[in-house]
């Protein structure tokens, strides 16, 4: 026997035995693995409103998703006590092995308390609005329609730092769709072509402009009279009293003047036609009405007879006020603070500047020639 042939056959590889059958190939290929189910596959619309409740308090989106998965809703959390909230958070940690951040524990309680305060404030406002609608007055009955909602300076609460990016990434698409639908619904046509804003199409209905009316006269058509304008200041005073009573009950700082807090309260109470720009714009006209009603009525009649617009009447209201200040030592702030209905309003900057300029003019002219200067209107 040839030894070389023996060694050749010993080390000869049978490659055919190593090739598996095609059917075996198919059996050996593992089936495609399904992607693991997302641990937090709760979409924003399935969070039962928890995303709006928690988003500004630094609570992670996945934490809210786990709370919703346990079956909790906003109404359920609002009706729970602090001890029950602690039990809920402990259950969340034990069942899902989910580590809650310290800030999240405080944030959940803070969000629930803030929502309770908001709901508590809205209930008396609605009741007061319903009761206030029954009171009749002789103001512009035909001009109470079509009020606008103008911007009021609001102090936006800073959102918490934890988990905000996750919230935005998950819920941004849903919010865009909802905001787009709301904007489409809010677009209305401005029916008053000669309004102060002049836009043909806007996102909110504009309030009908004011016209100069005599005392007791009711404006007709799409206009508001001056009696109605002065009535808005009385409403602001009522809203300030309500804000003060709420602040006293809570032990918070009590405002003494009409501030942004009062305008926000009026807006939430449904009186969106009361806003800071408009009320500050005509506050000196209301001051003349309070300090010298006869002079205010005479000025209204004169401008009504001449057919002047409300802008010219507004400018003319400065001069009688400066004359009143000249008779009381030019201290316009003391004049406002001494009057019960004006003490809650800030003195307009232009009125203070006019009093200051006229005082300097009167002082300089009296020292030189003894004659008074003219008001720079």
UniProtKB/Swiss-Prot annotation:
<keyword id="KW-0010">Activator</keyword>
<feature type="DNA-binding region">
    <location>
        <begin position="275"/>
        <end position="282"/>
    </location>
</feature>
<keyword id="KW-0539">Nucleus</keyword>
<feature type="compositionally biased region" description="Polar residues">
    <location>
        <begin position="131"/>
        <end position="141"/>
    </location>
</feature>
<dbReference type="Pfam" id="PF01698">
    <property type="entry name" value="SAM_LFY"/>
</dbReference>
<dbReference type="InterPro" id="IPR038276">
    <property type="entry name" value="Floricaula/leafy_C_sf"/>
</dbReference>
<dbReference type="Pfam" id="PF17538">
    <property type="entry name" value="C_LFY_FLO"/>
</dbReference>
<dbReference type="InterPro" id="IPR035209">
    <property type="entry name" value="FLO/LFY_C"/>
</dbReference>
<comment type="function">
    <text>Probable transcription factor.</text>
</comment>
<dbReference type="InterPro" id="IPR035079">
    <property type="entry name" value="LFY_SAM"/>
</dbReference>
<comment type="similarity">
    <text>Belongs to the FLO/LFY family.</text>
</comment>
<keyword id="KW-0238">DNA-binding</keyword>
<keyword id="KW-0217">Developmental protein</keyword>
<feature type="site" description="Interaction with DNA">
    <location>
        <position position="311"/>
    </location>
</feature>
<feature type="site" description="Interaction with DNA">
    <location>
        <position position="264"/>
    </location>
</feature>
<feature type="site" description="Interaction with DNA">
    <location>
        <position position="253"/>
    </location>
</feature>
<feature type="DNA-binding region">
    <location>
        <begin position="206"/>
        <end position="210"/>
    </location>
</feature>
<dbReference type="GO" id="GO:0005634">
    <property type="term" value="C:nucleus"/>
</dbReference>
<feature type="compositionally biased region" description="Basic and acidic residues">
    <location>
        <begin position="116"/>
        <end position="126"/>
    </location>
</feature>
<keyword id="KW-0804">Transcription</keyword>
<feature type="region of interest" description="Disordered">
    <location>
        <begin position="116"/>
        <end position="190"/>
    </location>
</feature>
<feature type="DNA-binding region">
    <location>
        <begin position="346"/>
        <end position="349"/>
    </location>
</feature>
<dbReference type="GO" id="GO:0003677">
    <property type="term" value="F:DNA binding"/>
</dbReference>
<keyword id="KW-0805">Transcription regulation</keyword>
<dbReference type="InterPro" id="IPR002910">
    <property type="entry name" value="FLO_LFY"/>
</dbReference>
<feature type="site" description="Interaction with DNA">
    <location>
        <position position="260"/>
    </location>
</feature>
<protein>
    <recommendedName>
        <fullName>Floricaula/leafy homolog</fullName>
    </recommendedName>
</protein>
<dbReference type="GO" id="GO:0006355">
    <property type="term" value="P:regulation of DNA-templated transcription"/>
</dbReference>
């Amino acid at each position: 026997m040839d030894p070389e042939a023996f060694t050749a056959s010993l080390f000869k590889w049978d490659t055919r035995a190593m090739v598996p059958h095609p059917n075996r190939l198919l059996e050996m290929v593992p089936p495609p693995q399904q992607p693991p189910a997302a641990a937090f596959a709760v979409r924003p619309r399935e969070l039962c409103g928890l995303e709006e409740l928690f988003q500004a308090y630094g609570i992670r989106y996945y934490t809210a998703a786990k709370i919703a998965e346990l079956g909790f809703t906003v109404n359920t959390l609002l009706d729970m006590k602090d001890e029950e909230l602690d039990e809920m958070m402990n259950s969340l940690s034990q069942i899902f092995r989910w580590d809650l951040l310290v800030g999240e524990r405080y944030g959940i309680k803070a969000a629930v308390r803030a929502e309770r305060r908001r709901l508590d404030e809205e209930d008396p406002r609605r009741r007061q609005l319903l009761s206030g609608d029954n009171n009749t007055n002789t103001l512009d009955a035909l001009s109470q329609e079509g009020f606008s909602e103008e911007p009021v300076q609001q102090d936006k609460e800073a959102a918490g730092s934890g988990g905000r990016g996750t919230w935005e990434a998950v819920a941004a698409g849903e919010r865009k769709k909802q905001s787009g639908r709301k904007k489409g619904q809010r677009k209305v046509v401005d029916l008053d072509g000669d309004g102060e804003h002049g836009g043909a199409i806007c996102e909110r209905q504009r309030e009908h402009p004011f016209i100069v009316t005599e005392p007791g006269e009711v404006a007709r058509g799409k206009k508001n009279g001056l009696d109605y304008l002065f009535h808005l200041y009385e409403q602001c005073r009522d809203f300030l009293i309500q804000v003060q009573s709420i602040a006293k009950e809570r032990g918070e700082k009590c405002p003494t003047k009409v501030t942004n807090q009062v305008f926000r309260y009026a807006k939430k109470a449904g009186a969106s036609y009361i806003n800071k720009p408009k009320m500050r714009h005509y506050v000196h006209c209301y001051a003349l009405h309070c300090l010298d009603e006869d002079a205010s009525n005479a000025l209204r009649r004169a401008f009504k007879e001449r057919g002047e617009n409300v802008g010219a009447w507004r400018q003319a209201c400065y001069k009688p006020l400066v004359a009143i200040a000249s008779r009381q030592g030019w201290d316009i702030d003391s004049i406002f603070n001494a009057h019960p209905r004006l003490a809650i309003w800030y003195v307009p900057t232009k009125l203070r500047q006019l009093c200051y300029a006229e005082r300097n003019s009167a002082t300089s002219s009296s020292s030189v020639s003894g004659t008074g200067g003219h008001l720079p209107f």
